[in-house]
Amino acid sequence: MRLNELSPAPGSKKDRKRVGRGDAGRGNYSGRGMKGQKARSGGATRPGFEGGQLPIYLRLPRKRGFFNPFRIEYTVVNIEQLNIFEAGTEVTPETMLAAGLIRNFVKPVKILAAGHIDRALEVSAHKFSQAAKAQIEAAGGKVQEIDYAAEIE
């Protein structure tokens, strides 16, 4: 076998379409139909053009604001969910994972004040709402914030 004897496998190369070369096959109108704007050279409309009707991208309201790529999304745990722990327990993201309150450690944990807590717990999380902090401390518990930035590094 030599380089000059190499050839592509049969059927792997297709002949290109040659339009407008005689009346057989794709001759005459060359697949463009008869007359009209799209039959002319350079006659294609711009993307989004709807024939003069107000296009959909102008009919719909614009999306406003911006998307912050550096935002921190939290896994939310409500304080009523913490009632599954015994009084005096130290509640950390690890114990929450073991109890099934959170699924994984991908996002930091934030404690919110939905519901009521009726026991004193030592709760450690990355973030607390003010109302959640107040309710935990009112029930005789303690609140400790974990530094998420230090955990990442």
From Swiss-Prot:
Gene Ontology molecular function: rRNA binding; structural constituent of ribosome
Coiled coil: none
Assembly behavior: Part of the 50S ribosomal subunit.
PROSITE patterns: RIBOSOMAL_L15 (PS00475)
Gene Ontology CC, one term: cytosolic large ribosomal subunit
Function description: Binds to the 23S rRNA.
GO biological process, one term: translation
Protein name: Large ribosomal subunit protein uL15
Superkingdom field: Bacteria
Keywords: Ribonucleoprotein, Ribosomal protein, RNA-binding, rRNA-binding
Similarity annotation: Belongs to the universal ribosomal protein uL15 family.
Claim: Phosphoprotein is one of the keywords in the record: no
Region Disordered: start-end pairs: 1-48
Pfam families: Ribosomal_L27A
